[in-house]
């Protein structure tokens, strides 16, 4: 019965659908007889000028966040409490089990704006017309260390406010030419060891290209290793003539060294000096300052060098040690007294009469012949 009456009432009601904002009040349509929530209202031509605070409105559902105690203690509700530290067992990490990279897994390179980069066989590389670019370096499509065939390892350095690139692949066998020999005195006074025996042979086809890149490597190494005052120990022993650096190369090194490095150089010790290195320095006097010439010091043995600098961290090549032993052996043999040479008695010559006695004998013979 009630259902039938409700149906008859709904047939007489004209329902019009419209979009209504939930919270913002707006004028009701003129031809509506139903309130938003279904309660009948009077049809008025003027919009309402008051808000209905007593009527039923739709309310949004508000989510209340749980109370969190932001503190560093482990009390209940704190961020450091055990309630927030529940993690599955597979996420537990033991720091001791983490493997650290080996020294061989990383490339050693220096800072101060220097950076390593790989350059493939690109037009930039081929345009430089460098030795070995026309074909593989070893002819079998692989490099010396088994890496990419057309890849070269480069280092970008800044020398004298100019950017240069060093071909590390070409100078790799000669990098031992410059080493750090520790410190002397108080502070960071570095000892730079230059071993001439590790220089390339002048008969190599790419000798000038190698020396140019090796020159940049030596200069950049000095700028990285030197912090304050320093000295250079030049190991000249066991170096054949074909590996001696030329005058032009030494002149270029001196001219491109930064003024700070030239000023902070306190001594240049030349160990086992040869006549060639003395001649080179004598010829180089016109373009070398007098202050630099006064810093040169000659040392003839490693024993004398030990009296000047600490030798704990100075790496002496094996060929230089062997050269030192040969020199000491030759010096001992030359200092040994030589035995006097005495003729045996059977080989002794008969005594010769003096000149006066000989003239007397001649006169006696003449007298006997005249008589």
From Swiss-Prot:
The record marks 105-106 as: Cleavage. Residues 11-29 have a biased composition (Basic and acidic residues). Residues 190-371 are annotated as: Mediates interaction with GLS. Residues 1-54, 331-371 are annotated as: Disordered. It is found in: Cell projection, Axon; Cell projection, Dendrite; Presynapse; Mitochondrion. Keywords: Cell projection, Cytoplasm, Disease variant, Mitochondrion, Neurogenesis, Synapse, Transport, Ubl conjugation. GO terms for biological process: apoptotic process; mitochondrion distribution; negative regulation of glutamate metabolic process; neuron projection development; regulation of protein localization. InterPro entries: Bcl2-/adenovirus-E1B, CRAL-TRIO_dom, CRAL-TRIO_dom_sf. One of its GO terms (molecular function) is kinesin binding. Residues 42-53 have a biased composition (Polar residues). Pfam families: BNIP2, CRAL_TRIO_2. Residues 115-120 are annotated as: Required for interaction with KLC1. The keyword Ubl conjugation applies. Changing residue 105 to E: Alters cleavage by CASP3. It comes from the Eukaryota. One of its GO terms (cellular component) is dendrite. Residues 171-328 form the CRAL-TRIO domain. Cleaved by CASP3 and CASP7. The potential C-terminal product released by CASP3 cleavage may inhibit the ERK signaling pathway through MAP2K2. Interacts with KLC1; may link mitochondria to KLC1 and regulate mitochondria localization into neuron projections. Interacts with GLS; the interaction is direct and may control GLS localization, negatively regulating its activity. Interacts with PIN1 (via WW domain); upon NGF stimulation. The interaction with PIN1 and GLS is competitive. May interact with MAP2K2. Functions in the development of neural tissues, particularly the postnatal maturation of the cerebellar cortex. May play a role in neurotransmission through regulation of glutaminase/GLS, an enzyme responsible for the production in neurons of the glutamate neurotransmitter. Alternatively, may regulate the localization of mitochondria within axons and dendrites. The CRAL-TRIO domain is known to bind small hydrophobic molecules. It is linked to Cerebellar ataxia, cayman type: Found in a population isolate on Grand Cayman Island and causes a marked psychomotor retardation and prominent nonprogressive cerebellar dysfunction including nystagmus, intention tremor, dysarthria, and wide-based ataxic gait. Hypotonia is present from early childhood. This is Caytaxin. It comes from Homo sapiens (Human). The gene is ATCAY.
């Amino acid at each position: 019965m009630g259902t039938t009456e409700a149906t008859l009432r709904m047939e007489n009601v004209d329902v019009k659908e419209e979009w209504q904002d939930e919270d913002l009040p707006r004028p009701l349509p003129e031809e509506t007889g139903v309130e938003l929530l279904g309660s009948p209202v009077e049809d008025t031509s003027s919009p309402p000028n008051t808000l209905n605070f007593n009527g039923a409105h739709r309310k949004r559902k508000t989510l209340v966040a749980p109370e969190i105690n932001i503190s560093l203690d482990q009390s209940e509700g704190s961020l450091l409490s055990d309630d927030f530290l529940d993690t599955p067992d597979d996420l537990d990490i033991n720091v001791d089990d983490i493997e650290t990279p080996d020294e061989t897994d990383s490339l050693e390179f220096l800072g101060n704006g220097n950076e390593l980069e790989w350059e493939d066989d690109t037009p930039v590389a081929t345009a430089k017309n460098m030795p070995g670019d026309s074909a593989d370096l070893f002819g079998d499509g692989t490099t010396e260390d088994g890496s990419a065939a057309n890849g070269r390892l480069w280092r970008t350095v800044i020398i004298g406010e100019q950017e240069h690139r060093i071909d590390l692949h070409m100078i790799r066998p000669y990098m031992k030419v410059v080493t750090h020999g520790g410190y002397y005195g108080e502070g960071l006074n570095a000892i730079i060891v230059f071993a001439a025996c590790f220089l390339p042979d002048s008969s190599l086809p790419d000798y000038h290209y190698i020396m140019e890149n090796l020159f940049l490597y030596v200069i950049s190494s000095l700028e990285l290793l030197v912090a304050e005052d320093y000295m250079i120990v030049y190991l000249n022993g066991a170096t054949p003539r074909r590996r001696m650096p030329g005058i032009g190369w030494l002149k270029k090194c001196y001219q491109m060294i930064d003024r700070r490095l030239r000023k902070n150089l306190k001594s240049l010790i030349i160990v086992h000096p040869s006549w060639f290195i003395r001649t080179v320095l004598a010829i180089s006097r016109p373009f070398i300052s007098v202050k630099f010439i006064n810093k040169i010091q000659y040392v003839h043995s490693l024993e004398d060098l030990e009296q000047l600098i600490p030798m704990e961290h100075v790496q002496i090549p094996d060929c230089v040690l062997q050269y030192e032993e040969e020199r000491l052996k030759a010096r001992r043999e030359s200092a040994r007294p030589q035995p006097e040479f005495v003729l045996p008695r059977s080989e002794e010559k008969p005594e010769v009469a003096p000149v006066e006695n000989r003239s007397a004998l001649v006169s006696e013979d003449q007298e006997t012949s005249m008589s």
